[in-house]
Amino acid sequence: TFENTATSAAMEHNVVLLTDNADATINRVGQAAMSAAANAYVPEDDGVLAATDLAKPGETVTLTFTAPSEPGEYAYICTFPGHYAMMQGTMRVIQ
């Protein structure tokens, strides 16, 4: 569950979980998102594992998915234009 606590009406966010933690995947998906406005800035890319809807300020979105069975680190980013470089984190899958 993600709550967008931003106060600016233009500050939408999402959470996009990626298939790995590689900089190449993060950059490719983040850059491709800028051309994916019709799909809420989530690009059609094999590097995308799951994604929330865009959350406007004050909104809460929930993502239900099956975590990868392979232990490792999986990046998540915000793909709203210009956000992915600073808005990212890591989900760790352990046994």
Predicted regions and their residues:
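Short loop segments at secondary-structure junctions
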Residues: 20-21, 95
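Extracytoplasmic beta-sandwich strand-turn segments characteristic of Greek-key/jelly-roll folds
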Residues: 22-69
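Beta-strand signatures of extracellular beta-sandwich domains
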Residues: 14-18
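Extracellular/periplasmic metallocenter environments
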Residues: 3-10, 49-95
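Proteins with a high burden of low-complexity, intrinsically disordered sequence enriched in S/T/G/P/A and R
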Residues: 1-2, 25
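Short, solvent-exposed loop/turn elements at domain surfaces
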Residues: 8-13, 24-26
